[in-house]
Amino acid sequence: YDRKPTNGAGFVCHGQRFVGGGEAVVDLLAAYSTTVLDALELKHGPSHMEVKLAPGSGAPCLVEVGARCHGGEGYWMSVADECCGRNQVCAALDAYVDAAAYAKLPPRPPAALAARGRLKYLLFHKGGTLADIDAAVVDQITALPSYRGHEFFVAAGAAVVPTKDCFTWGGVVKLNGADEAQVDRDYAFLADVSARDPGLWVIA
């Protein structure tokens, strides 16, 4: 998660990044997560977990765990598929109905990812009535090299408030591609047009 203080709230999620198995933090998180699941006696099925790394020590600290797949209506599934050729939902189905296929799955994503996936949430930095979503900016978004799809959670006429949680996002954009620097640039562009006034959002 890309979380940071925003609009007076201390822990606002701006986006998500798909992490490859070659990153050093993966071993730490995998070991810690396994310990948590064992302690909770969650032995069957998928789980979703949020873990923070303590400043300074880098020690993992549990925020939450759910006995389910990662949420977000599965919007991330195609991002995972492009990054490593599989996703948690399909792996869970294999566990239930195809033991042979499940047994072939590696314990974590490959070290070398085929693509560098991101989800970028579209934040509001101003409250009021959403007069419009600028079509020209939407065209710029869909033309981004790493663009893979988007969804708006609001429409013209809606009352909006500055984003402080997942219930006040304006939308989400899927990004993916082999060029990580390009994905980072596109991610930064989305942050900019969401914050600009006027930008993506035309708020009265």
How would you label these PLM feature ranges?
Residues 61-64:
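Protein kinase-like catalytic core scaffold
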Residues 15-31, 181, 190-193:
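Active-site nucleotide/adenylate-binding loops and adjacent lid/helix of ATP-dependent enzymes
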Residues 52-56:
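Short beta-strand micro-motifs enriched in acidic
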